[in-house]
Curated annotation (Swiss-Prot):
Role: Single strand-specific metallo-endoribonuclease involved in late-stage 70S ribosome quality control and in maturation of the 3' terminus of the 16S rRNA.
PROSITE patterns (UniProt xref): UPF0054
Species of provenance: Mesorhizobium japonicum (strain LMG 29417 / CECT 9101 / MAFF 303099) (Mesorhizobium loti (strain MAFF 303099))
GO cellular component: cytoplasm
Manner of cofactor binding, per the entry note: Binds 1 zinc ion.
GO BP, sorted A to Z: rRNA processing
Principal location listed in the UniProt entry: cytoplasm
Origin superkingdom: Bacteria
Cofactor(s) required for function per UniProt: Zn(2+)
HAMAP family linked: Endoribonucl_YbeY
Protein name in the entry: Endoribonuclease YbeY
Length: 166
């Protein structure tokens, strides 16, 4: 069984605030375990060290659609959005607050069903994906997408979760 604390420094790299605001999600304690493991795995793969804070909001399609329209000009729900609190340059020091990751219940569940994977695995992947955005990664170009997906695959492999891109 993979260890829950993969950062190796005796504690989690970030103080995580979890909020279940809307939608049909697993219990909050289960979500907290998924998020903790996802964050530890992402930090282990990126080599980022230090301490920070992170907010993860579990919401629904209606809420994320509003956020997506307001912040990205896309009037439709999406699976995950990330909102950095401060600019973060890869290789730089962690800011005191990384930002917010927001997930949408209906979209996450629908995608997991379509891809025939456990919803917990999909949640874990999306938390890692959202966190990588907060850590300065993106997927606007093919090269960026390949680099980001490689980190996601490696972080998920640490947790014995199959490659979501296979």
């Amino acid at each position: 069984m993979p260890e829950d604390n993969l950062s190796g420094d005796g504690g989690p790299p970030v103080d995580i605030d979890i909020s279940v605001e809307a939608g049909d999600w697993p219990d909050e304690a289960g979500l907290a375990r998924l998020v903790d493991r996802a964050v530890d795995a992402a930090f282990a793969e990126t080599g980022v060290t230090g301490r920070s804070e992170l907010s993860v909001v579990f919401s629904d399609d209606a809420h994320i659609r509003t956020l997506n329209a307001e912040w990205r000009g896309k009037d439709k729900p999406t699976n995950v959005l990330s909102f950095p609190a401060f600019p973060f340059a890869q290789g730089g020091p962690l800011p005191p607050m990384l930002g917010d990751i927001v997930l949408a219940a209906e979209t996450v569940s629908r995608e997991a069903a379509l891809e025939d994977k456990p919803v917990q695995n999909h949640i874990t992947h999306l938390v890692i994906h959202g966190l990588l955005h907060l850590l300065g990664h993106d997927h606007e170009t093919d090269a960026e997408a390949e680099a980001m997906e490689a980190i996601e695959r490696a972080a998920l492999a640490r947790l014995a979760i199959p490659d979501p891109y296979a």
